[in-house]
Amino acid sequence: MHATNSARLFERAGNVIPGGVNSPVRAFGSVGGTPRFIREASGYTLTDVDGNNYVDLVSSWGPMILGHAHPAVVEAVREAALGGLSFGAPTEGEVALAEEIVARVAPVEKVRLVNSGTEATMSAVRLARGFTGRTKIIKFSGCYHGHVDALLADAGSGLATFGLPTSPGVTGAQAEDTIVVRYNDLDAVAAAFAANPGAIACVITEAAAGNMGAVAPLPGFNEGLRRLTREHGALLIMDEVMTGFRVSASGWYGIDNVAGDLYTFGKVMSGGLPAAAFGGRADIMGHLAPDGPVYQAGTLSGNPVAVAAGLASLRAADAEVYAKLGRNATALGDLMTQALTAEGVEHRVQYAGTLVSVFFTENTVTNYDEAKAAQTWRFPAFFHALLSRGVYPPPSAFEAWFVSAALDDRAFSIIADAMPHAAKAAAAAVKP
């Protein structure tokens, strides 16, 4: 399996695109080697520009729960595109998508469509500040909420991949208003409220963490956040960009029934096109322009083609799709466990709903510090052994693995053949 054409494209891209990619994790920076440039995809298969096929375990970082080029989604996009690509005016489709989201997540009474998860979290935090009249926010170490200045402090995802505590360009004033505490630590949250009486506008959390690897909230954690925010007059923002409509038809809310005040969504609700949303209680959402004083806008928000893709994806994701996602996540985790156990490699396979991760440690990982303490130096060898045998996992030890309902017996046969080689490579890896 060679990557000659990918290497040429990567070099060419580096002349005109910073780092040769448009999102840092795609550069293979933490695993080394040549990032694969993808030509096309169908079902569970990615095909790169060198003609190599891979079983996709990234799913475009979450959106593709049905697999790639699903007929219902492709037809919806084709039909919408024939009717026009963008109008800068309201459409029936955006109403239908908002209605679908509201119907699925009970605490969400109104929704505003945007273009990315970053826009959604940025807007939700601004709205929380505008609604409460407060400025400070609490976020959790290792939780990633997009590249919003105020939310980049000690974030997961790409920042974790590259070992960055924050980003240059984030001002001291912005950082001062962001209080970072340890995930799954209610005592730390309570202490932050006690130290900042009447100043905290919101707590923003991934409903289940997926950007330090898959780390589910400990029993009672989300419930505790709900209690503390109510006690202190702050809002609770549940970031479900990753978990929303993937871990269940109602997202993580469908698992623990803990009601946030505001929610952010993306990925699955986009059908693979640029679309996201934030929503919540009607009285809070009523503070948004044009009804209220908190400004938010977007030229392409509610784009008719993206809305059509998202609506088709949600409607095609029936009960059997969610059941299959669960089976596929478990099957993937079992294959990792069997292979790594056979090689005597310390590891822990973890799930956050149907998000999957492997940590090279014998301990359960419950927060970012524990994720970083794992033997992450084993991951590059593990990754490349899979990639060279036709399996495409996330190119970072700190990202969740995303299965799709398109994975079938043939796909799992390929994974099963590759996994023992990956386990051997992980076992043979040498700490730098």
UniProtKB/Swiss-Prot annotation:
Pathway: Porphyrin-containing compound metabolism; protoporphyrin-IX biosynthesis; 5-aminolevulinate from L-glutamyl-tRNA(Glu): step 2/2. The keyword Isomerase applies. The keyword Cytoplasm applies. PROSITE patterns: AA_TRANSFER_CLASS_3 (PS00600). Its cofactor is pyridoxal 5'-phosphate. It is found in: Cytoplasm. It comes from the Bacteria. CDD domains: OAT_like. GO terms for molecular function: glutamate-1-semialdehyde 2,1-aminomutase activity; pyridoxal phosphate binding; transaminase activity. SUPFAM superfamilies: PLP-dependent transferases. Its EC number is 5.4.3.8. Pfam families: Aminotran_3. The modification N6-(pyridoxal phosphate)lysine is found at residue 267. Keywords: Cytoplasm, Isomerase, Porphyrin biosynthesis, Pyridoxal phosphate. GO terms for cellular component: cytoplasm. Gene3D superfamilies: Aspartate Aminotransferase, domain 1, Type I PLP-dependent aspartate aminotransferase-like (Major domain). It is an enzyme of class 5 (isomerase). InterPro entries: 4pyrrol_synth_GluAld_NH2Trfase, Aminotrans_3, Aminotrans_3_PPA_site, PyrdxlP-dep_Trfase, PyrdxlP-dep_Trfase_major, PyrdxlP-dep_Trfase_small. It catalyses: (S)-4-amino-5-oxopentanoate = 5-aminolevulinate. GO terms for biological process: protoporphyrinogen IX biosynthetic process. Belongs to the class-III pyridoxal-phosphate-dependent aminotransferase family. HemL subfamily. Homodimer. PANTHER family: GLUTAMATE-1-SEMIALDEHYDE 2,1-AMINOMUTASE, GLUTAMATE-1-SEMIALDEHYDE 2,1-AMINOMUTASE 1, CHLOROPLASTIC-RELATED. NCBIfam families: hemL (TIGR00713), PRK00062.1 (NF000818). This is Glutamate-1-semialdehyde 2,1-aminomutase. The gene is hemL.
